[in-house]
Design a protein with these regions (language model features):
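Conserved small/aromatic sequence motifs within transmembrane helices
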Residues: 1-145
Length: 145
């Protein structure tokens, strides 16, 4: 399913001045390109459900660095590319700690730390944190649609 309008990529060029992210990525809170239902799905995290298919296929894991669009990944510095040493994941430590929306270098460092420290114990801790995080997202999305 689609959470953004078909013209989202073209519209991004017009929205570059509103980019809230540092580094080579494009992020806008309350992105105007979302469809009505897409906004709800994105705010609750339900837009990630189709990614479970990629996990079942073996292309992704539940936990790990979030994949970047190809054009953005091509702009990474060499040290930042270490995040690609493992398969991408649906749930990133950077999302759970908030560095995903802060500083790009902090986000990359969080991803690389996960690559270096990856273990079953780390994934269990992330799973517990993710459940708490998703519960909070759902509550906020229902309270503020």
């Amino acid at each position: 399913f689609r959470t953004m309008r078909v013209t989202a990529e073209k519209e991004q060029k017009k929205l570059l001045s509103r980019n809230e992210a540092s580094g080579p990525v494009f992020k806008i809170r309350n992105d105007p390109r979302h469809t009505g239902i897409g906004k709800f799905l994105a705010h609750t995290g339900l837009d990630e459900i189709p990614q479970l298919y990629n996990v079942l296929r073996g292309d992704m894991t539940l936990f790990g660095p979030r994949p970047l669009p190809v054009a953005e990944a091509a702009k990474l510095k060499s040290w930042q590319k270490k995040r690609h040493d493992i398969k991408p994941g649906i749930i990133s430590p950077a999302i759970l700690t908030g560095t995903y929306h802060e500083d790009f270098d902090a986000w990359m460092k969080s991803d690389i730390a996960y690559v270096k420290e990856k273990s079953l114990g780390y994934d269990v801790r992330l799973a517990v944190r993710a459940l708490s995080f998703l519960t909070g997202l759902m509550e906020r999305a229902v309270a503020n649609p």
